């Protein structure tokens, strides 16, 4: 867990590249494989800029998704107050899954069927990020792989054994937004990114049919 990761120096941030990609760390010439399951979760404060450093593109590309939390709703705010009213709820945490169950779940996504049409849909979306006039840095091949993985996981959570175009569309923003560099940023970057991504999605034809793992049209 990297809290406010953009406060780390570029040298410290670069040290994460090996463990994020290769699941290993090298110290003084000695390489150690990291135990599984392993993942990197980081937070970033977009408001404060003093004492912060921009995250390099190579590091951003290794984060599967980026989610903006925003402020809690009224209901969520009340629930937070209730939980912290008497004691810190973090003091009473129970595991919800074993290590083996997590590893098995991580392996299951690769079994989710993806039709040729959906694969082409993913690639066309990614290619559009490289051709859009407002984008100076488009999505890399690693980003297209991340979009595929996220769509497969989305299908699992929705109770299906195949990926639909909607799974892909719903994952475009969290998977691709942080991988894109806009040419001219005037005002709020987030708003401009949303507009650009919407333009890309509207410009790529959606496959007319989803095909399940047994070959049935749906």
Predicted regions and their residues:
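Walker B beta-strand of ABC/ABC-like P-loop ATPase nucleotide-binding domains
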Residues: 1-4
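Canonical AAA+ ATPase core
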Residues: 7-8, 12-15, 20-97, 102-112, ...
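Alpha-helical structural signal
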Residues: 13, 37, 60-61, 77, ...
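Short acidic/histidine-centered micro-motifs embedded in hydrophobic/aromatic stretches
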Residues: 19, 83, 125, 170-174, ...
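Alpha-helix N-cap and coil->helix boundary residues
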Residues: 55, 76, 113, 117, ...
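Conserved AAA+ ATPase small/helical "lid" subdomain
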Residues: 92-147
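C-terminal engagement/docking regions of AAA+ P-loop ATPases
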Residues: 131-218
């Amino acid at each position: 867990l990297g809290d406010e990761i953009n406060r780390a120096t570029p040298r410290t941030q670069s040290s994460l590249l090996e463990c994020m990609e290769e699941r290993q760390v090298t110290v003084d010439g000695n390489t150690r494989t990291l135990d599984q399951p392993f993942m990197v979760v980081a937070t970033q404060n977009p408001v404060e800029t003093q004492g912060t450093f921009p995250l390099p593109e190579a590091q951003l590309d290794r984060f599967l998704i980026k989610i903006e939390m925003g402020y809690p709703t009224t209901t969520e705010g009340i629930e937070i107050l209730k939980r912290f009213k008497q004691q810190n709820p973090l003091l009473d945490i129970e595991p919800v899954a074993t290590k083996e169950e997590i590893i098995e779940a991580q392996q299951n996504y690769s079994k989710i069927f993806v039709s040729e049409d959906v694969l082409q849909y993913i690639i066309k979306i990614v290619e559009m990020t490289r051709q859009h006039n407002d984008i100076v840095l488009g999505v890399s091949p690693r980003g297209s792989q991340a979009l595929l993985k996220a769509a497969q996981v989305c299908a699992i959570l929705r109770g299906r054994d195949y990926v639909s175009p909607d799974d892909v569309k719903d994952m475009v923003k969290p998977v691709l937004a942080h991988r894109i560099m806009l040419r001219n940023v005037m005002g709020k970057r987030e708003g401009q990114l949303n507009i650009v991504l919407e333009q890309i999605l509207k410009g790529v034809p959606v496959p007319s049919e989803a095909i399940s793992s047994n070959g049935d049209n749906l």
